[in-house]
Amino acid sequence: MNQVEMTEFPVGKPQEALYGVASTPDGALWFTLAKGNAIGRLSPDGAVSRFPLPHADGQPTTITCGPDGRPWFTLSSANAIGRLAPDGALRMFELPRPASRPFGIAGGHDGCLWFAEMAGDRIGRITIDGDIEEYDLPVKGGYPSCMAAGRDGLMWFTLNQAGAVGSISATAAPRIFPLGAADAAPVGIASDAQGALWIAQAGNGAIARFDAGGRITEFPLHSRAARPHAIAADAAGNLWFTEWGANRIGRISEAGDLAGYELAAPGSEPHGIAIDPHGCVWAALETGRLVRLQASPRD
């Protein structure tokens, strides 16, 4: 792989808790400011726009590009799902049951958005028109966290406190699959081109591969304290992830080869991660910056 060039873009203040990031087809990066109570947009020309949210403490967290090409995001404290149009027009969809604390969100093969309810022990599904369905999980206190669309047509999710992953669809009941390590504390999840799922295990500092046959392979990182958090797949077969506890961005190939890239400033606290249409990797740093990683020719 070519050398990696890292560039940082200031988009917020440290006290605003920059958290999630997503790319839309127009090349823009959208991000959440969990304590700034706003959604931001970094345009391809470098301009930064902010869209304040109506709740005083909505806590926008995870964000994704929906099937309609627009950014969709969860508001954990406001108990809602939000959607923004390119011109900043906002729509909010409150969840049917209070204090569900939605967190992870991802587009599904069915043209809907699926989200995890941390405190509700449920997975939710919302159409682009705002119709919501909820599905109870068979595990209580599992802390459903992040979502990903699998190549098998199912939606997959992590259960942070249960040390497990699960699958679901609108017609298939939820199934739960324990991971190999009791202290895994899985957070991020992504699917590769071969149909395998890759899981960021924050608890034991490892990336796990869950293949189509249900086999689990664990790849320990350089430190158990690395606390891998979010993970995303690129078109070249690599999985990129944030190491919240180690101040790095990590990469693992489908063969299990690991690499890591140190961030410029100590204590950057990387959280969300996304791949843009050009194949560049973007991560959200709690210091109020987005960092872009792109391949550069060798010297």
Curated annotation (Swiss-Prot):
Record-listed Mg(2+) binding positions: 269, 286
EC number: 4.2.99.-
GO biological process: antibiotic catabolic process; response to antibiotic
Catalytic residues (positions): 271
Binding site for substrate: 229
Keyword line: Antibiotic resistance, Lyase, Magnesium, Metal-binding
SUPFAM superfamilies xref list: Calcium-dependent phosphotriesterase
Domain of life: Bacteria
Gene Ontology CC terms: outer membrane-bounded periplasmic space
Principal EC category: lyase
Stored Gene3D superfamilies: YVTN repeat-like/Quinoprotein amine dehydrogenase (2.130.10.10)
Record InterPro entries: Streptogrm_lyase, Vgb, WD40/YVTN_repeat-like_dom_sf
Pfam families the record matches: Vgb_lyase
PANTHER family tied to this protein: VIRGINIAMYCIN B LYASE (PTHR40274:SF3)
Quaternary structure, from the entry: Monomer.
Function summary: Inactivates the type B streptogramin antibiotics by linearizing the lactone ring at the ester linkage, generating a free phenylglycine carboxylate and converting the threonyl moiety into 2-amino-butenoic acid.
Family: Belongs to the Vgb family.
Name of protein: Virginiamycin B lyase
Species in which this protein is naturally found: Bordetella bronchiseptica (strain ATCC BAA-588 / NCTC 13252 / RB50)
Lineage: Bacteria, Pseudomonadati, Pseudomonadota, Betaproteobacteria, Burkholderiales
Gene behind this protein: vgb
